[in-house]
């Protein structure tokens, strides 16, 4: 049936800024996905309300977190998605605090203890990173960190993308080469998903 959505993607913006470079990058990926008929939602961690992990280890016995906040809704949306993309800017050489706090709250899903919760099988993950610095090493560390998170959740990493030298919004928005490269990445991933 024409117009029917067979794949769903959840794109997670881990930047403290709602409308900065990370949002622009995810927007380009979302456009490419939508053009290929992939149902796409962008979720900004900055507007979600969740506390830090308490380290209480209750989830080691119950596979559930004792804290009730927006983490459960985020995980529900991840559970419903076929593809999950997480984008983080470089903050002091790594992922943002918002993303780290969310990852820590996913401890009920850690295979390091039994019982543990699990997302449905077959999900694919895309990691994206941005940095103000020109040195790509920090972006590569961000990508590796996100991919490790995916693997522990049973999500198969399928692609990653990074761009360096983007401190201000103009550094990305006024750089046709970087915009075209990011749009091309989104298009190629969308093609691979709907083969």
Task: Please annotate each region the language model reported.
Residues 38, 115-118, 166:
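Sparse recognition of residues in long alpha-helices and their boundaries
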């Amino acid at each position: 049936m024409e117009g029917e959505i067979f794949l769903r993607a959840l794109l997670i913006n881990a930047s403290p800024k709602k409308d900065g470079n990370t949002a622009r990058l995810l927007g380009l990926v979302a456009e490419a996905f939508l053009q290929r008929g992939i149902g796409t939602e962008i979720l900004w961690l900055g507007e979600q309300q969740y506390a830090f992990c308490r380290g209480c280890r209750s989830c080691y016995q119950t596979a559930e977190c004792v804290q009730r906040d927006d983490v459960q809704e985020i995980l529900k949306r991840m559970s419903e998605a076929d593809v999950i993309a997480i984008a983080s800017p470089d903050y002091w050489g790594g992922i943002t605090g918002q993303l780290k706090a969310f990852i820590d709250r996913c401890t009920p899903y850690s295979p390091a203890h039994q019982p543990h919760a699990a997302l449905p099988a077959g999900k694919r993950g895309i990691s994206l990173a941005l940095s103000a610095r020109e040195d790509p090493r920090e972006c590569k560390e961000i990508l590796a960190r996100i991919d490790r998170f995916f693997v522990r959740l049973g999500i198969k990493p399928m692609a990653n993308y990074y761009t360096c030298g983007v401190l201000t919004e103009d550094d990305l928005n006024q750089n046709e080469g970087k915009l075209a490269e990011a749009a091309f990445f989104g298009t190629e991933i969308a093609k691979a998903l709907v083969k």
